[in-house]
């Protein structure tokens, strides 16, 4: 397992570099295993990356790509807060990916209504169905992540029950400190099944958490510290986010 850091002048250059790398990673996964399993993230950089992929759509063999989500806001299907809705606008409406290879999390006005726990369990079943027999989740090729100023990733917040989860792949979050409060999230054990984990982080408000996570903080306190890939962990930072790393 390796870990590396790349620093860029600004978030636009960061996103373009991440997008170019992801196009290559998808191609390599398809060549090696016949498919590419990618976990998407929301946030400014995550959605900008999807717009980059849309512009480079001809370089990707979409019939071989499966898309998952690291977390989702448990709001109605058409709510602008939905990561899925943002992903549709940025990418999915513009590429020819089979609908059964897009694996979104449930919405609050969907099959499970207000039952957040049932929605989380259902996504665990989605992951298991996409995994090798007997495995709880796939070995994702790339899990994309953003990070909050306190070090949260997906909807795993510091000192929360979700970040403490050690066995389940997906859990419900009903008291997120960042609105909306009700969410579904992949856990650290699910993230750690990924071959590669990429963290795209920009802005001066993230510098302390970046330094803590890379410096080996307890993931309970800084969840991003637990975002580790089986083969590679890649931090893609702008200069502001990297400002407090040792020189």
Curated annotation (Swiss-Prot):
| Protein family per UniProt | Belongs to the glucosamine/galactosamine-6-phosphate isomerase family. 6-phosphogluconolactonase subfamily.
Q: Which GO terms describe its biological process?
A: carbohydrate metabolic process; pentose-phosphate shunt
What EC number is given for this enzyme?
Answer: 3.1.1.31
User: Which reaction(s) does its UniProt entry say it catalyses?
Assistant: 6-phospho-D-glucono-1,5-lactone + H2O = 6-phospho-D-gluconate + H(+)
- Pfam families reported in the protein's UniProt record: Glucosamine_iso
**GO (cellular component) term, any one:** plasma membrane
This chain belongs to the protein called 6-phosphogluconolactonase
Q: What class of enzyme is it?
A: hydrolase
Which GO molecular function annotation, any one, does this entry have?
Answer: 6-phosphogluconolactonase activity
Its lineage opens with: Bacteria, Bacillati, Actinomycetota, Actinomycetes, Mycobacteriales
Pathway entry: Carbohydrate degradation; pentose phosphate pathway; D-ribulose 5-phosphate from D-glucose 6-phosphate (oxidative stage): step 2/3
